Amino acid sequence: HLTDILRSYVEPAQRNGPPLYQSLIDAGLATLWSAVRGFAIGGVFGFALAIVFAHSSLMTRGLLPYVVASQTVPILAIAPMIVIWMSRAGAIDWAVPVIAAYLTFFPVTIYTLRGLTSVPTTALELMESYAASRREILFKLRLPNALPQIFTALKISATASVVGAIIGELPSGIQNGMGIAILNFSRYYNQSPPRVWATIFAAGLIGMLFF
């Protein structure tokens, strides 16, 4: 029942421990920090990739199919491999943000590319007739035209980064985060279902706030 879920927030998460809401705040902040870093990495990478594709049809034909194919592989299958690679590279602290970035870069790439390449033909021909450089066309025509698409992509990617961070926490071995909290409470679901649902609702709230 909803009342049981709400009551569980003020009950101790563990015996003689702090209230559940306090534990979830700590876990939520850890997840949010990973999501923010992943959002930044994925956003910058996706934006740069879209600019490259917008200026090179060869790169678009050669790489875009692989970008699309990368999103057909379940993130749950890729996350453990990323954790292993980052651990071997001595950057295990960045494993979760990288997993979050993996889900973030794709919407940014696709939406930004669509905005950059959907400029009015007459406007593009006019700038070319004035011998405008590629850089001038990019900053004065393509980017302003793509802004609505970019903002849409960022809103989608914001929630995707939270999902990626939560999933990335599961195989990473970290001690704090919403993913770990959900996993730990799920082990005792039969004993205390409200705690699991309270944690899931808190994770959803983080995604809504980041959106």
Residue ranges and their predicted role:
Residues M178-F211:
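Hydrophobic alpha-helical transmembrane segments of polytopic membrane proteins
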Residues I25-V36, T60, V67-S70, L147, ...:
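Alpha-helical membrane-interface segments at transmembrane helix boundaries
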Residues V98-Y102, R135-G168, A198, A202:
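Transmembrane alpha-helices
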